[in-house]
């Protein structure tokens, strides 16, 4: 077998990936690691133009190509436009990672209709229509990878019902969408991160730890590490590595599943 055609496990050379909400945080790590594996990457952002463009340059340094496309995927017409533009960049689309989302905390008696709609519009409705457009545009044998959370099924957090529920719906989506997408041999899965050290983590970590407001951000991070038997924090690259596996040929037989990426917490 010639080197030109030899399959290298977990490589994504020749593939094109779109990652929504990838200007920073976990999404940026997904885009970076997909690029490191050889994929060309479309970095989607809603507002973080500067960081998205910087990420594009970092991905190019890995020896592949990348572009940034703006769209707010909480708005379906913009999602439709994003995919129409994405398919024109390199003429194909093989991997779609639905990452954009927001966090929310509030006791049941405090939650307003406006907050409910904000969270579900982005975390649930937005992801559903990203998946719809992905199915329309992906090549046969493509990958759809959605974003859940370990709080959707394994880790109940007080005052976190909206967020947890919005992510729990994703786990139901992937089970059914995996069947719906079978005609095109597209697999549909989700990753469910635990606490992951990003700027968002530092903003909200006090909610996850009882009495968390009494501690500094650094102290809360150290305490969070003990949620895992490995006694370390999760980082965006941990989530991204799972995504690369699901996107690869080696991940083909995983379908309709939600993969917990939380260090056993």
Swiss-Prot record:
PROSITE patterns per the UniProt record, alphabetical: ADH_SHORT (PS00061)
EC number per UniProt: 1.1.1.-
UniProt-listed InterPro entries: NAD(P)-bd_dom_sf, Sc_DH/Rdtase_CS, SDR_fam
Protein known as: Short-chain dehydrogenase/reductase GME11373
Sequence similarity: Belongs to the short-chain dehydrogenases/reductases (SDR) family.
Pathway connected to this protein: Secondary metabolite biosynthesis
Domain of life assignment: Eukaryota
Organism name: Pestalotiopsis microspora
Record's function text: Short-chain dehydrogenase/reductase; part of the gene cluster that mediates the biosynthesis of dibenzodioxocinones such as pestalotiollide B, a novel class of inhibitors against cholesterol ester transfer protein (CEPT). The biosynthesis initiates from condensation of acetate and malonate units catalyzed by the non-reducing PKS pks8/GME11356. Pks8/GME11356 lacks a thioesterase (TE) domain, which is important to the cyclizing of the third ring of atrochrysone carboxylic acid, and the esterase GME11355 might play the role of TE and catalyzes the cyclization reaction of the C ring.
Keywords, alphabetical: NADP, Oxidoreductase
Binding positions for NADP(+) per the UniProt entry: 26, 72, 99, 132, 163, 167, 198
Statement: the UniProt record of this protein carries the keyword Oxidoreductase: yes
Active site (record annotation): 148 (proton donor), 149 (proton donor), 163 (proton acceptor), 167 (lowers pka of active site tyr)
Gene3D superfamilies: NAD(P)-binding Rossmann-like Domain
């Amino acid at each position: 077998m010639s080197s030109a055609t030899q399959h290298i496990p977990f490589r994504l050379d020749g593939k094109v990936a779109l990652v929504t909400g990838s200007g920073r945080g976990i999404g940026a790590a997904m885009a970076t690691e997909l690029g490191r594996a050889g994929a060309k990457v479309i970095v989607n952002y809603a507002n973080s133009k500067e960081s998205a463009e910087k990420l594009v340059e970092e991905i190019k340094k890995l020896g592949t190509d990348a572009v940034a496309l703006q769209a707010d995927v909480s708005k379906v017409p913009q999602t439709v436009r994003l995919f129409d533009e994405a398919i024109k960049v390199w003429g194909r689309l093989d991997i779609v990672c639905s990452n954009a989302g927001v966090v929310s905390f509030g006791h049941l008696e405090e939650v307003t209709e406006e907050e409910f709609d904000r969270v579900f519009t982005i975390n649930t409705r937005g992801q559903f229509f990203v998946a719809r457009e992905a199915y329309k545009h992906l090549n046969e044998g493509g990958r759809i990878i959605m974003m859940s959370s370990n709080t959707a099924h394994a880790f109940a957090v007080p005052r976190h019902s909206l967020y947890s529920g919005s992510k729990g719906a994703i786990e139901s989506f992937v089970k059914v969408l995996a069947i719906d997408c079978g005609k095109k041999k597209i697999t549909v899965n989700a990753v469910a991160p635990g606490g992951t050290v990003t700027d968002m983590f530092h903003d909200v970590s006090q909610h996850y730890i009882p009495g968390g407001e009494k501690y500094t951000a650094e102290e809360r991070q150290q305490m969070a590490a003990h949620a895992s038997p490995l006694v370390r924090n999760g980082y965006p690259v941990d989530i991204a590595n799972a995504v690369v596996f699901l996107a690869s040929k080696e991940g083909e037989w995983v379908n309709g599943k939600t993969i917990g990426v939380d260090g056993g917490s």
